[in-house]
């Protein structure tokens, strides 16, 4: 199909009923480094993989503080995420100033959905090329929300977005029944294990490339970076594929090729 006929602007529909500019923005989210969000009955946790633009540059921030009860992790264009984060901070400040109370998480997510929908319907605008995982805690308990460049948003028990995030989602689906009863340390470890699934076999999580955000009952949103991550990583078991295999003694003869394999 000649997509160039229908992807010049966000207001043009293809004959198949698709808007290609929005689909391209969704692809931008998949280019960002992976991030994971999950919740229990008392806490919501964000775990993100940080990248460095080069060996000479510092790692980029992946988890941002919005309010005392809300934080976000991002995948996609950092500049777009910064703009949306500033919008969210302003809405939270307005709620505290006008109503003297924290802004409910679901209300904030609804406002983000309305803001990101505007450039998907107006000529000369482009969709925001960033996906967000929003972690928060309010009177309804802990929350994990996912937002998309298409202006859709979803209430999740656990979610992962970004590059190679399907591997993390597979882990989350396998262990989802355990999350609600987990304590905080176990919940963070589940998030780290899920994030580790997105890495190639030769890489592993370190204090330099991991960032953790936690919010919960009687706990304001807190970001852990660098050395603060060490206590969480120390209790994490080694990846099965990275465990060293015992070396075969040199004097032990190799198995014969014609011997049947054991099952």
From Swiss-Prot:
Glycosylation sites: 110
Record's signal peptide: none
Keyword field: Acetylation, Cytoplasm, Glycoprotein, Immunity, Isopeptide bond, Nucleus, Phosphoprotein, Proteasome, Ubl conjugation
InterPro entries noted in UniProt: Ntn_hydrolases_N, Proteasome_alpha, Proteasome_alpha-type, Proteasome_alpha1, Proteasome_asu_N, Proteasome_sua/b
N-acetylmethionine modifications at: 1
Primary role: Component of the 20S core proteasome complex involved in the proteolytic degradation of most intracellular proteins. This complex plays numerous essential roles within the cell by associating with different regulatory particles. Associated with two 19S regulatory particles, forms the 26S proteasome and thus participates in the ATP-dependent degradation of ubiquitinated proteins.
Subunit structure: The 26S proteasome consists of a 20S proteasome core and two 19S regulatory subunits. The 20S proteasome core is a barrel-shaped complex made of 28 subunits that are arranged in four stacked rings. The two outer rings are each formed by seven alpha subunits, and the two inner rings are formed by seven beta subunits. The proteolytic activity is exerted by three beta-subunits PSMB5, PSMB6 and PSMB7. Interacts with NOTCH3. Interacts with ZFAND1.
Stored PANTHER family: PROTEASOME SUBUNIT ALPHA/BETA (PTHR11599)
Descriptive protein name: Proteasome subunit alpha type-1
